[in-house]
Amino acid sequence: MSIEVIRPGINTTFQDRGRSNLYHLGIPFSGAMDTRNLLITNKLVGNDKNDAVIEFALQGPKFKVKQNNINCVVTGNVSFTFKKNSKIYNGECYKTFDLNNNDEIDIISTNNSMYGYFSISGGFKIEKKWNSYSTHLRSKVGPNKGNKIVENDLLQLNKNLKPIIKKSIDYSNSKIEFIRVIKGTNFDYFSKESQKSFFESQYQVTNLTDRMGMRLDGNKLNNIKSENIKSEGLIKGVIQVPPDGKPIICLLYTSPSPRDETK
């Protein structure tokens, strides 16, 4: 029981809710970038909330099914089609659909968003690493030997013992209008002009953004503290400011190890 990867898409990996209990050992959290859509994905296909899903960024994967009676779902703001009995249908996010042997699903792209999710009833036959199905690419930890899903991979499936029940929900991925910021321990290390500029200026997300951090381009933040800065650990959501003065929002691959940049 498997599905074949015809096209891997961009940054396609297995993810779950992450490794929340190993941060003190220097192991990053990992996990799905959009936890809400992860949970919805598993709920719609009848899987446990801690089961793995496939996460993709921008362009999604294309799969060919190698067994009958698979119940699937795609979540996020995503365009996709599926080929069933040689006919192509436009897919609808947050609505399950069934596929049979040699049918295909083509997840074309996300729309005005970064990440999308795919799963099947019964889940994927993969092993946990450190009590999680999450993939951490930089350290090669997780299913698939810690690697991205690639062309010609055969993704093994668990046998689905539950009856297939078609489900759908009306769900809108709302646009965030405001981001709340709390002053950190290093806030007073920046000039008054930089503090004011940070809250009043616009910043552009750059193409250097990845699962470790969201890199921003905009007004430079000037650090006025000349002596060495005490190193502190990092967590998701911390805004780190390297020597070039361009902020980085720490995300799920953030290393808990101390850094010398201001926050």
Locate each region found by the language model.
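Short active-site-adjacent structural elements
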Residues: 14, 248-250, 259
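Residue-level "contact hotspot" at macromolecular interaction interfaces
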Residues: 37, 98, 148, 240-241
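Conserved, well-structured core segments that form or line functional sites
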Residues: 79-80, 88-90, 94-225
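Single conserved hydrophobic/aromatic residue that forms the stacking wall/gate
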Residues: 253-263
